[in-house]
Curated annotation (Swiss-Prot):
GO biological processes: 3-phenylpropionate catabolic process
Family: Belongs to the AB hydrolase superfamily. MhpC family.
Site positions (Transition state stabilizer): S114
Species the sequence originates in: Escherichia coli O157:H7
Name the UniProt record assigns to this protein: 2-hydroxy-6-oxononadienedioate/2-hydroxy-6-oxononatrienedioate hydrolase
Keyword check for Metal-binding: no
GO cellular component: cytoplasm
Amino acid sequence: MSYQPQTEAATSRFLNVEEAGKTLRIHFNDCGQGDETVVLLHGSGPGATGWANFSRNIDPLVEAGYRVILLDCPGWGKSDSIVNSGSRSDLNARILKSVVDQLDIAKIHLLGNSMGGHSSVAFTLNWPERVGKLVLMGGGTGGMSLFTPMPTEGIKRLNQLYRQPTIENLKLMMDIFVFDTSDLTDALFEARLNNMLSRRDHLENFVKSLEANPKQFPDFGPRLAEIKAQTLIVWGRNDRFVPMDAGLRLLSGIAGSELHIFRDCGHWAQWEHADAFNQLVLNFLARA
Protein backbone atom coordinates (compact mmCIF):
# COMPACT_ATOMS: atom_id res chain seq x y z
CA MET A 1 0.00 0.00 0.00
CA SER A 2 1.48 3.35 -1.04
CA TYR A 3 2.11 6.07 1.52
CA GLN A 4 -0.57 8.74 1.78
CA PRO A 5 0.86 12.18 2.61
CA GLN A 6 -0.39 13.80 5.80
CA THR A 7 -2.76 16.76 5.52
CA GLU A 8 -3.31 19.61 7.94
CA ALA A 9 -7.10 19.20 7.99
CA ALA A 10 -7.11 15.45 8.60
CA THR A 11 -4.63 15.64 11.48
CA SER A 12 -6.05 18.74 13.22
CA ARG A 13 -6.90 18.25 16.92
CA PHE A 14 -7.80 20.39 19.97
CA LEU A 15 -7.38 19.94 23.72
CA ASN A 16 -8.23 22.16 26.68
CA VAL A 17 -5.32 23.07 28.95
CA GLU A 18 -5.41 24.82 32.31
CA GLU A 19 -2.91 27.67 32.65
CA ALA A 20 -2.81 30.26 35.45
CA GLY A 21 -6.42 29.64 36.38
CA LYS A 22 -7.66 29.90 32.80
CA THR A 23 -8.71 27.28 30.28
CA LEU A 24 -6.91 27.56 26.95
CA ARG A 25 -8.01 25.74 23.81
CA ILE A 26 -4.82 24.43 22.24
CA HIS A 27 -4.50 23.24 18.66
CA PHE A 28 -2.09 20.59 17.44
CA ASN A 29 -1.67 18.18 14.54
CA ASP A 30 -1.29 14.48 15.30
CA CYS A 31 0.36 12.54 12.47
CA GLY A 32 1.37 8.90 12.16
CA GLN A 33 1.18 6.03 14.62
CA GLY A 34 4.74 5.15 15.58
CA ASP A 35 5.90 3.83 18.94
CA GLU A 36 8.20 6.85 19.32
CA THR A 37 6.84 10.40 19.23
CA VAL A 38 8.57 13.47 17.81
CA VAL A 39 7.17 16.86 18.88
CA LEU A 40 7.86 19.79 16.55
CA LEU A 41 7.78 23.29 18.06
CA HIS A 42 7.57 26.35 15.80
CA GLY A 43 9.20 29.78 16.06
CA SER A 44 7.75 33.12 17.13
CA GLY A 45 7.19 34.79 13.77
CA PRO A 46 3.82 36.42 13.05
CA GLY A 47 1.51 33.90 11.40
CA ALA A 48 3.66 30.91 12.37
CA THR A 49 2.02 27.53 13.01
CA GLY A 50 3.37 24.08 13.64
CA TRP A 51 2.21 22.91 10.23
CA ALA A 52 3.50 25.92 8.29
CA ASN A 53 6.87 25.77 10.05
CA PHE A 54 7.49 22.07 9.38
CA SER A 55 5.47 21.28 6.25
CA ARG A 56 8.58 19.91 4.51
CA ASN A 57 9.56 17.63 7.40
CA ILE A 58 6.37 15.86 8.51
CA ASP A 59 6.06 13.12 5.89
CA PRO A 60 9.67 11.88 6.11
CA LEU A 61 9.30 11.44 9.88
CA VAL A 62 5.95 9.67 9.56
CA GLU A 63 7.26 7.45 6.75
CA ALA A 64 10.20 6.51 8.99
CA GLY A 65 7.74 5.21 11.59
CA TYR A 66 7.41 8.11 14.04
CA ARG A 67 4.29 9.63 15.48
CA VAL A 68 4.59 13.39 14.92
CA ILE A 69 2.92 16.07 17.07
CA LEU A 70 2.94 19.67 15.82
CA LEU A 71 1.89 22.13 18.51
CA ASP A 72 0.45 25.59 17.91
CA CYS A 73 1.80 27.41 20.96
CA PRO A 74 -0.65 29.73 22.76
CA GLY A 75 -0.75 32.95 20.78
CA TRP A 76 -0.17 31.29 17.40
CA GLY A 77 -2.21 29.45 14.83
CA LYS A 78 -5.54 28.01 15.95
CA SER A 79 -4.63 27.99 19.65
CA ASP A 80 -6.11 30.56 22.03
CA SER A 81 -4.34 33.88 22.45
CA ILE A 82 -2.68 35.01 25.67
CA VAL A 83 -0.82 37.95 27.18
CA ASN A 84 2.29 36.53 28.81
CA SER A 85 4.32 38.45 31.39
CA GLY A 86 6.70 35.64 32.36
CA SER A 87 8.98 33.33 30.41
CA ARG A 88 7.33 32.53 27.08
CA SER A 89 9.35 29.33 26.78
CA ASP A 90 8.35 28.05 30.21
CA LEU A 91 4.72 28.78 29.30
CA ASN A 92 5.06 26.79 26.06
CA ALA A 93 6.74 23.97 27.98
CA ARG A 94 3.87 23.78 30.49
CA ILE A 95 1.32 23.72 27.67
CA LEU A 96 3.21 20.94 25.91
CA LYS A 97 3.47 18.96 29.16
CA SER A 98 -0.31 19.12 29.58
CA VAL A 99 -0.90 18.06 25.97
CA VAL A 100 1.39 15.02 26.08
CA ASP A 101 -0.01 14.07 29.50
CA GLN A 102 -3.54 14.10 28.09
CA LEU A 103 -2.36 12.06 25.10
CA ASP A 104 -0.73 9.58 27.52
CA ILE A 105 2.70 9.91 25.89
CA ALA A 106 5.42 9.08 28.41
CA LYS A 107 8.51 10.24 26.49
CA ILE A 108 9.06 12.47 23.47
CA HIS A 109 11.83 13.53 21.14
CA LEU A 110 11.82 17.32 20.84
CA LEU A 111 12.63 19.28 17.69
CA GLY A 112 12.36 23.04 18.03
CA ASN A 113 13.03 25.98 15.73
CA SER A 114 13.98 29.39 17.21
CA MET A 115 11.42 29.99 20.00
CA GLY A 116 10.62 26.30 19.66
CA GLY A 117 14.24 25.46 20.43
CA HIS A 118 14.20 27.67 23.50
CA SER A 119 10.90 26.10 24.59
CA SER A 120 12.39 22.63 24.04
CA VAL A 121 15.24 23.52 26.39
CA ALA A 122 12.72 24.77 28.96
CA PHE A 123 10.78 21.49 28.74
CA THR A 124 13.97 19.44 29.05
CA LEU A 125 15.16 21.37 32.10
CA ASN A 126 11.78 20.97 33.82
CA TRP A 127 11.00 17.36 32.89
CA PRO A 128 14.25 15.66 31.80
CA GLU A 129 12.80 12.19 32.32
CA ARG A 130 10.21 12.88 29.59
CA VAL A 131 12.76 13.68 26.86
CA GLY A 132 14.42 11.18 24.55
CA LYS A 133 16.51 13.18 22.09
CA LEU A 134 16.74 16.92 21.46
CA VAL A 135 17.13 18.80 18.17
CA LEU A 136 17.66 22.57 18.49
CA MET A 137 17.56 24.78 15.39
CA GLY A 138 18.43 28.45 15.48
CA GLY A 139 17.50 28.82 19.15
CA GLY A 140 17.84 27.41 22.64
CA THR A 141 19.89 29.66 24.88
CA GLY A 142 18.61 33.21 25.06
CA GLY A 143 21.16 35.73 26.32
CA MET A 144 23.49 38.02 24.42
CA SER A 145 25.72 37.45 21.41
CA LEU A 146 29.48 37.94 21.62
CA PHE A 147 29.72 39.30 18.08
CA THR A 148 26.34 40.64 16.96
CA PRO A 149 24.57 43.72 18.36
CA MET A 150 21.25 42.82 19.97
CA PRO A 151 18.46 42.81 19.07
CA THR A 152 19.49 41.46 15.71
CA GLU A 153 18.36 42.89 12.39
CA GLY A 154 15.93 40.01 11.99
CA ILE A 155 14.32 40.44 15.41
CA LYS A 156 13.88 44.16 14.76
CA ARG A 157 12.03 43.42 11.53
CA LEU A 158 9.95 40.72 13.24
CA ASN A 159 8.86 43.13 15.97
CA GLN A 160 8.03 45.78 13.37
CA LEU A 161 5.85 43.26 11.55
CA TYR A 162 3.94 42.49 14.75
CA ARG A 163 3.24 46.20 15.22
CA GLN A 164 2.47 46.93 11.57
CA PRO A 165 1.28 43.72 9.86
CA THR A 166 1.51 44.75 6.21
CA ILE A 167 2.65 42.85 3.14
CA GLU A 168 5.56 45.30 2.84
CA ASN A 169 6.82 44.56 6.36
CA LEU A 170 6.30 40.83 5.83
CA LYS A 171 8.50 40.93 2.73
CA LEU A 172 11.13 42.96 4.59
CA MET A 173 11.28 40.30 7.30
CA MET A 174 11.23 37.31 4.96
CA ASP A 175 13.91 38.88 2.77
CA ILE A 176 16.47 38.19 5.51
CA PHE A 177 14.70 35.17 7.01
CA VAL A 178 16.12 32.81 4.40
CA PHE A 179 19.37 32.89 2.42
CA ASP A 180 17.89 32.18 -1.02
CA THR A 181 14.75 34.24 -1.50
CA SER A 182 13.84 32.66 -4.86
CA ASP A 183 11.50 30.20 -3.10
CA LEU A 184 9.53 33.02 -1.49
CA THR A 185 6.53 33.01 -3.81
CA ASP A 186 3.57 35.36 -3.84
CA ALA A 187 1.43 32.41 -2.71
CA LEU A 188 3.65 31.93 0.34
CA PHE A 189 3.47 35.63 1.22
CA GLU A 190 -0.30 35.64 0.79
CA ALA A 191 -0.76 32.54 2.96
CA ARG A 192 1.45 33.93 5.72
CA LEU A 193 -0.24 37.34 5.64
CA ASN A 194 -3.69 35.72 5.79
CA ASN A 195 -2.57 33.65 8.79
CA MET A 196 -1.43 36.81 10.53
CA LEU A 197 -4.47 38.94 9.79
CA SER A 198 -6.95 36.18 10.64
CA ARG A 199 -5.78 36.39 14.27
CA ARG A 200 -5.10 40.03 15.06
CA ASP A 201 -5.54 39.14 18.74
CA HIS A 202 -2.35 37.07 18.48
CA LEU A 203 -0.45 40.03 17.04
CA GLU A 204 -1.78 42.51 19.59
CA ASN A 205 -1.19 40.20 22.55
CA PHE A 206 2.39 39.47 21.48
CA VAL A 207 3.10 43.22 21.54
CA LYS A 208 1.37 43.54 24.92
CA SER A 209 3.47 40.65 26.21
CA LEU A 210 6.69 42.36 25.12
CA GLU A 211 5.57 45.54 26.83
CA ALA A 212 4.84 43.61 30.04
CA ASN A 213 8.16 41.73 29.87
CA PRO A 214 10.69 42.57 27.13
CA LYS A 215 12.74 39.48 28.07
CA GLN A 216 10.24 36.79 27.04
CA PHE A 217 13.10 34.35 26.43
CA PRO A 218 15.45 34.23 29.45
CA ASP A 219 19.09 33.19 29.33
CA PHE A 220 19.29 29.41 29.87
CA GLY A 221 23.08 29.43 29.41
CA PRO A 222 23.95 28.81 33.09
CA ARG A 223 21.71 25.71 33.15
CA LEU A 224 22.72 24.02 29.90
CA ALA A 225 25.03 21.60 31.75
CA GLU A 226 21.93 20.07 33.36
CA ILE A 227 20.81 18.68 30.00
CA LYS A 228 21.72 15.02 29.63
CA ALA A 229 19.64 14.18 26.55
CA GLN A 230 21.49 13.44 23.32
CA THR A 231 21.38 16.76 21.49
CA LEU A 232 21.78 17.77 17.86
CA ILE A 233 22.22 21.50 17.22
CA VAL A 234 21.45 22.83 13.73
CA TRP A 235 22.24 26.34 12.50
CA GLY A 236 22.27 28.36 9.31
CA ARG A 237 25.64 29.92 8.50
CA ASN A 238 23.82 33.08 7.37
CA ASP A 239 21.23 33.33 10.17
CA ARG A 240 20.39 37.02 10.72
CA PHE A 241 17.83 36.40 13.48
CA VAL A 242 19.77 34.34 16.04
CA PRO A 243 23.57 34.63 15.69
CA MET A 244 25.59 31.50 15.04
CA ASP A 245 27.61 31.92 18.22
CA ALA A 246 24.44 31.01 20.13
CA GLY A 247 24.80 27.56 18.58
CA LEU A 248 28.41 27.40 19.75
CA ARG A 249 27.22 28.31 23.24
CA LEU A 250 24.81 25.37 23.16
CA LEU A 251 27.59 23.10 21.91
CA SER A 252 29.85 24.20 24.75
CA GLY A 253 27.17 23.97 27.42
CA ILE A 254 25.48 20.63 26.61
CA ALA A 255 27.83 17.71 27.18
CA GLY A 256 28.11 15.33 24.23
CA SER A 257 26.12 17.58 21.89
CA GLU A 258 26.98 18.00 18.22
CA LEU A 259 26.57 20.95 15.87
CA HIS A 260 25.73 20.92 12.16
CA ILE A 261 26.01 24.21 10.27
CA PHE A 262 24.35 24.53 6.86
CA ARG A 263 26.06 26.90 4.45
CA ASP A 264 23.91 29.24 2.34
CA CYS A 265 21.22 29.02 4.99
CA GLY A 266 19.29 31.54 7.05
CA HIS A 267 17.00 31.01 10.04
CA TRP A 268 14.86 28.22 8.55
CA ALA A 269 17.19 25.25 7.99
CA GLN A 270 14.35 22.72 8.02
CA TRP A 271 12.74 24.52 5.07
CA GLU A 272 15.76 25.88 3.18
CA HIS A 273 17.65 22.56 3.16
CA ALA A 274 14.74 20.22 3.78
CA ASP A 275 16.10 17.01 2.23
CA ALA A 276 19.51 17.22 3.90
CA PHE A 277 17.92 18.34 7.16
CA ASN A 278 15.43 15.47 7.17
CA GLN A 279 18.16 12.90 6.59
CA LEU A 280 20.34 14.47 9.28
CA VAL A 281 17.52 14.31 11.84
CA LEU A 282 16.43 10.78 10.90
CA ASN A 283 20.00 9.50 11.24
CA PHE A 284 20.30 11.21 14.63
CA LEU A 285 17.01 9.82 15.93
CA ALA A 286 17.84 6.29 14.75
CA ARG A 287 21.25 6.27 16.39
CA ALA A 288 21.59 4.24 19.60
